[in-house]
Amino acid sequence: DMDSTLIQTEVIDELADLAGVGEQVRAITESAMNGEIDFKESFKKRMALLEGLSEEVLHNVAVNLPITKGAHRLMKALKYYGYKTAILSGGFTYFGNYLQKELGIDYVHANQLEIKDGKLTGNYIGDIVDGQKKAEFLQAIADKEGIHINQTIAVGDGANDLPMLNLAGLGIAFHAKPTVKENAATSISSLGL
């Protein structure tokens, strides 16, 4: 997972603040992460509120992402030992791709923002990456890399991470919402990555 896991923010909330709709979007995000409303529906509502936001704002947010303590060291160690890494996120490819370059991550699967004339349209391109899609991407990567799903590790914090966490050989709820902690086999709440 990316938001509130690999980075210490929910990017969509940051974008919403800059678009002047922060409180509205934050309330929808919280409900979705707690499993109170469907992720896909919440995603569409939040996207619509971002219409007109400048691509320049996206760049400024990307270069200032607060990367979780220990993430650089963890990714370097995983790479050294030959592990493949991925961002499977209900967030945005724009930021996932930035982190991929920054941290040397192998795969990124997230939602693609639709940008026209340098501004967000309030729409997205392709399928919404929800919990089920994250699990499907995890399985596809395992298949591509020739490993059994039991040899995978997934880390996440929100309700939309549960399908992926439950599919992985080791699923870790990281600084997770209460419902996620209750439903994940392993939970970490006090350390960095």
Model regions: which residues?
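Charged/polar, solvent-exposed surface patches and flexible loops
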Residues: 14-17, 27-30, 45-48, 60-64, ...
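C-terminal cap/substrate-recognition subdomain and adjoining C-terminal extension
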Residues: 52-193
